[in-house]
């Protein structure tokens, strides 16, 4: 009898033990999967950053689906003041990571938090700008991808090759943009080598830009060049329109400018850059610290030419540039 009665008790005890062991596993299985919240922002209402689609596609390829295991809060903003308000809102709401697409949004994000990870793109020199301690060891909560300010000299070389009569160049510079001094030095050195005379004008607002173009005399300059990222981000449509009205060629700082009439674009392949940034986002969400992820330079560049714009200016694209071009728009 004793041994017979122990059988049911043993079975009951085993059932209870298994129940205690399985219950946490069942609860874990029923717990909803983590939905990562990411804030992405950019300043410049008339366009979106060219690396945005590449970033989204890269995240999707890595298994992130917006609305399921990730929520992307994308904001395209008027100015840096709006970026500061947005960054503080995200920090208050507890986002898991911030993606900042140019210096104005990087400054806003950095000012808002020292804890939330920040991945930046479209920044020429993050060390000089004070965003990171070094390329190899960023420190803090920021990392990302730097541009190459020396691309400006290559852009001038291509400009001169496309426009053989280029002698005097209207250069628009924003003195309030921290990158302007650095860019100016590169452009001035390249211009001296190419024997170009720079007609430099300081502008910060749309009214300033209108005034400078309105004061130009016929034949005073042969083309237009920008050296301040803030101008490139904020005044795309205005500068293209004013240059076109005065029949002045200019290169585009983004491929988008070429689709709207700029003569050419030479620079970073931004869709590829967005894909690389997605990998950094993935690493951070999986536990990597921004301080330990080195700032990287873009690895892919492209030359985009606008044949219709060249014809409108009476220019013939040299065969050497046609061979180098990744795309020729017609």
Name each model-derived stretch.
Residues 1-330:
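Short hydrophobic alpha-helices and adjacent helix-cap/hinge residues
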